[in-house]
């Protein structure tokens, strides 16, 4: 439901109200959401567990009361129901087996760092290290297996670099643990934007 949060007077006669708009996707209307551990096409499988927990925490902060049941990995769940792919029949079977009304699945990928070299004139050379990362997520209902929502995020992050010139060598690399947390937080923030309310200002005469 749309709600007026507050008002600010301006210009003598007119004033403006801050209006809250509901999320695009209201997860609290779903009895129980089952979540599959995020897949990791390439890299450390622990990244998937981290992404899954961050996703759940972000959604439940945005919509307190959302009921989530962790189901395990997609491979484990499909094996339990004797299916090969997450198709409508498999989603229906998951619903019956686990008692969930919707299934949220996703993937996260952090590529291998890549190095670039930039030559500034004849006196300086800068080497940079960057990494590409992406996240995808989808929500299906288990009644007929229809897709209710999907979204994703991707980006490139700078890990650091070194500059060499006639003045010497300088630079450094970012702390890997802090950079990983930064990347995961940003991917989750963008991917879950449809689960958060938005706000706008409206003139009230």
Q: Where is each model-derived feature located?
A:
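N-terminal segment of the mature soluble domain
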Residues: 30-112, 138-142, 146-150, 181, ...
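Short alpha-helix boundary/capping motifs
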Residues: 86-88, 123, 173
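Outer-membrane beta-barrel translocator domains and adjoining extracellular loop/strand segments
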Residues: 117-122, 164-165
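Short coil/turn segments at secondary-structure junctions
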Residues: 39-43, 121, 171-179
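C-terminal/domain-edge helix-coil "capping" segments
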Residues: 13-31, 97-98, 113, 127-205
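Sec-dependent bacterial lipoprotein signal peptides
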Residues: 1-14
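Short, P/G- and charge-enriched loop/turn segments at secondary-structure junctions
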Residues: 91-93, 121-126
């Amino acid at each position: 439901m749309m709600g007026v949060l507050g008002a600010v007077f301006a210009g003598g006669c007119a004033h403006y109200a801050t209006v809250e708009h509901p999320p695009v996707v209201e997860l609290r209307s779903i009895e129980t959401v089952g979540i599959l551990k995020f897949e990791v096409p390439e890299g450390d499988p622990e990244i998937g567990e981290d992404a899954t927990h961050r996703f759940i925490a972000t959604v439940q902060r945005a919509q307190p009361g959302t009921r989530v049941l962790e189901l395990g990995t997609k491979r484990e769940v499909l094996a339990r129901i004797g299916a090969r792919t997450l198709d409508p029949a498999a989603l229906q079977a998951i619903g019956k087996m686990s008692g969930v009304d919707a299934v949220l699945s996703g993937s996260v990928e952090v590529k291998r760092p890549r190095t670039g070299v930039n030559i500034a004139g004849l006196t300086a050379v800068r080497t940079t290290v960057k990494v590409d990362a992406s996240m995808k997520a989808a929500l299906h209902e288990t009644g007929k297996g229809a897709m209710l929502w999907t979204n994703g995020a991707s980006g490139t992050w700078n890990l650091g670099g070194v500059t060499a010139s006639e003045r010497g060598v300088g630079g450094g690399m970012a702390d890997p643990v802090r950079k990983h947390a930064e990347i995961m937080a940003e991917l989750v923030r963008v991917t879950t934007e449809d689960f958060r309310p938005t706000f706008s200002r409206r003139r009230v005469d």
